[in-house]
Regions:
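Short catalytic/metal-binding and nucleic-acid-binding patches
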Residues: 1-154
């Protein structure tokens, strides 16, 4: 029996959305449940790749948190080359260089206001606590949170 194939998500930022708007994204590993990220050999490399893209203005990362089999991030993207291309290239680099296997595609949600931004920030930081991986958010080591978290201007 063939399983249904999920539709491919477009990840195109509409023209009416301001460039530099924040997006909540989730990227999952394949297979689910396998700890590919929260280990010294890959966790630091994934966070370093996130930081590299931030520092080179490929994207603007407000927060990235690694979980054993997925990551959550709040990122702003330039209109060109666009979210889909940027994330695809980043996943390809991390997979090729560090052996992380990703699921096809990723989830994104545009954060429409400051309330949503703060809500998703709290959700991300509390994720390892909810999963009983640590007692307090500040105890979780697999986080990239740059000092410059202001919205970008490309």
């Amino acid at each position: 029996m063939d399983l249904p194939v999920r539709k491919k998500l477009p990840h195109t930022i509409p023209q009416w959305v301001a460039e530099g708007s924040w997006f909540f994204i989730t990227i999952n590993c394949a297979p689910p449940g396998k700890n590919q990220r929260c280990r010294a050999d890959t966790g630091n490399a994934v966070l370093d790749a996130m930081k590299f893209n931030h520092e080179k203005f490929v994207w603007h990362c407000r927060l990235c948190l690694l979980m054993p089999d997925h990551l959550h991030a709040i990122i702003a993207f330039p209109r060109e080359p666009g979210m889909a291309t940027i994330v695809k290239n980043w996943k390809k680099f991390v997979a090729g260089k560090h052996g992380v296997s990703w699921q096809r595609d990723f989830f994104d949600h545009r954060l429409r206001d400051h309330h949503e931004l703060e809500e998703k920030t709290s959700y991300i930081l509390m994720n390892p606590v909810r999963k009983a991986l640590c007692k307090r958010p500040e105890d979780w080591e697999w986080v990239y949170r740059p000092n410059n978290r202001a919205p970008p201007s490309w």
